A protein has these predicted regions:
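Protruding loop/beta-arch "assembly-hinge" segments enriched in small, turn-prone residues
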Residues: 2-32, 37-40, 266-309
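Assembly/oligomerization interface modules of large self-assembling protein complexes
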Residues: 2-88, 152
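Generic recognition of stable, solvent-exposed alpha-helical segments in well-folded globular domains
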Residues: 18, 45, 103, 107-111, ...
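Extended oligomerization regions of viral-like shell subunits
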Residues: 44, 141, 145-274, 280, ...
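Short loop/turn segments at secondary-structure transitions that flank enzyme active sites
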Residues: 54-59, 87, 96, 118, ...
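Alpha-helical scaffold segments that mediate packing/assembly in large oligomeric complexes
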Residues: 70, 77-80, 85-168, 298-299, ...
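Extracytoplasmic/secreted cell-surface and envelope-processing proteins
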Residues: 100, 185-188, 286
Length: 309
């Protein structure tokens, strides 16, 4: 007796694969520095000079009725902020755009912005791939305020800890930026009485803050744990300005060369390709004006902790 059936292998040509109409992906991450720093008015040229108070006047007691009054002065200096360009070109064959079920250009642009945010944070905080036009990064400027771990109550909030280093310069800490991997260490952090510093119970979400200063854990991939585990400081003292906001242009003519060898890689017109070009220009500075607790402006409003030896 025949027992034949139409099996899956025999009907495979008639079975369509389902394509989910949404792409599974994380939300693009922004720049933590641009979130916390102070934005100035847009730059009108590639350089902006910021007047900064560099010397404070003094006052003196006068001895007796006919004592001589002393003189004093006040001075200012210019801090130069130079715009650097951040850009990328992404070539795409026109046939790929036509055949795709998704808006490739629309998918790429947010990821380019995310990549730019990571580059900005890495250059300003750690000096990673820093453009030559920019000033020294935050960690290099704060070398004298470095604290060697491990992460514990004393190294963060105690005498000689991160917060103390910033406060010794006459600054208050308004934020702490840390690697996402430091959360595990913070969850186990105890105060001097042996109580959890952050968690009051095991059910509720943990709100991370230190002495009133919120903690941030950027997820754009820019935080360099090989150079620091956490950075504390007065982030509002960082100023930045945009010379050219993110500008997107679709190129369909011209050639694209290898930046190293100058060899032509793509000829857009000849190969029926387009290229997404994204550009932005910005500058930043840490003016650090003189104060009564930082009269010569030599103290930096940042400190950071590194892993112990």
């Amino acid at each position: 007796m025949a027992t034949s059936i139409i099996a899956r292998t025999g009907a495979e040509a008639l079975i369509r694969d389902q394509l989910v109409n949404t792409i599974q992906q994380d939300v693009p991450k922004s720049s933590i520095v641009m979130q916390l720093a102070t934005r100035l008015a847009n730059m009108t040229s590639n350089q902006t000079k910021i007047p900064v108070l560099s010397m404070l006047p003094l006052a003196y007691w006068v001895n007796g009725d006919t004592g001589m009054k002393q003189t004093s002065k006040q001075e200012w200096k210019n801090v130069t902020m130079t715009a650097a360009e951040l850009a990328v070109i992404i070539p795409i064959p026109e046939a790929v755009l036509a055949d795709s079920s998704f808006d490739i250009m629309g998918e790429v642009q947010p990821r380019v912005r995310e990549a730019m945010a990571a580059k900005i944070d890495g250059a300003i905080l750690f000096g990673n791939d820093k453009p030559t036009e920019w000033t020294t990064d935050i960690l290099t400027q704060a070398t004298a305020n470095k604290v060697t771990g491990p992460i514990d109550y004393a190294k963060i909030l105690g005498d000689g800890g991160m917060f103390a280093k910033v406060e010794e310069g006459g600054f208050g800490v308004d934020g702490v930026v840390g690697s996402l991997s430091t959360k595990a260490q913070l969850r186990g952090l105890l105060d001097k009485n042996g109580r959890p510093l952050f968690r009051s119970d095991m059910q509720g979400a943990t709100n991370y803050a230190l002495d009133g200063a919120p903690l941030y854990f950027p997820e754009n991939g820019a935080f360099d744990v090989s150079k620091a585990l956490m950075i504390a400081g007065n982030f509002k003292k960082i100023v930045y300005s945009i010379r050219q906001d993110v500008t997107v242009k679709i190129l369909d003519q011209g050639v694209i060369q290898d930046p190293s060898t100058k060899e032509i890689m793509y000829n857009l017109a000849q190969q029926d390709m387009v290229a997404l070009r994204v550009i932005m220009r910005m500058g930043w500075a840490l003016p650090n004006p003189s104060t009564r607790l930082n009269t010569d402006g030599s103290k930096v409003p940042f400190s950071y902790i590194v892993a112990g030896e």
